[in-house]
Amino acid sequence: MKNIEKYRNLIAKGEVDALLLTSKHNRMYAAEYCVAEGVSVICKEESYYFTDFRYIEAAQKNLPGFTVVMTDADHPYTKLINDAIAAHTVKTLGFEDDSLTVEEYTLYNTKLNAVLHPYSAEINAPRQSKEP
């Protein structure tokens, strides 16, 4: 099973509509590739990876199964995340409450058009067991 499917299985439980992955460890696990900077949103049917111009080419080349979108001054992470969650009617967004700073949480909580649901334990769980 691809790692991204493990995260989709979490969404299928019905506690959240999508996942917001901000930590490098979980972004790398979901994508099965390391992009130095970015944010990922995992929805039931589609996965998004948002990054800036420095990493966009590598992300587009190495993240099959993700819709890769470039951030810039006119298209900050919060706007792009809102576009993605609106396209999938996301009301509740599970996030990594153990790794966001207060500043990041405040930004996402005030700018995103979804209720943030602390979900670190569930998001981290797939990384805790190795597959052969």
Where are these regions (language model features)?
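Flexible, acidic/His-enriched mid-domain "rim/lid" segments that flank
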Residues: 2, 76-132
